Amino acid sequence: AKAPVGNYVATKISGKLLFISGQVSIDQNGELIKGKLGKDLDTEAGYNAAKRCALSIVAQVKEACKGDLSKVNSCIKLTGFVNSTDNFIEQPKVINGASDLIVSIFGDSGMHTRAAVSTNSLPLGVSVEVDAVFELK
């Protein structure tokens, strides 16, 4: 799990809620996945970028739970931000990459509420950023 790049923490527990700060799209080599959907990347590439964000979310959850994912009761919400052109309208399909990964790992308890938001820019030029809220047992 990567450390934050600003004045905030990667995770915070409040009661039974675990908040995960936004995780940006990073490939398997640790390189940022950059670019704008609808210009530099297609929907499938965006889906894969969102999936990478979700992998980082799971890594942060695991670290916050001291290595024990069984401490997670459910995923409450994902918010996905997609760096996209004005004409790109497939943000939900992009963020499915994150949703599908979370559900594949946590099963029914991974089903969550969600927002998939278009933005004209994201930090460091990345293509996708996703944050999350989980409920702990």
Role assignments for model-derived ranges:
Residues 1-137:
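Short, polar/acidic, helix-capping and beta-turn segments at strand->helix junctions
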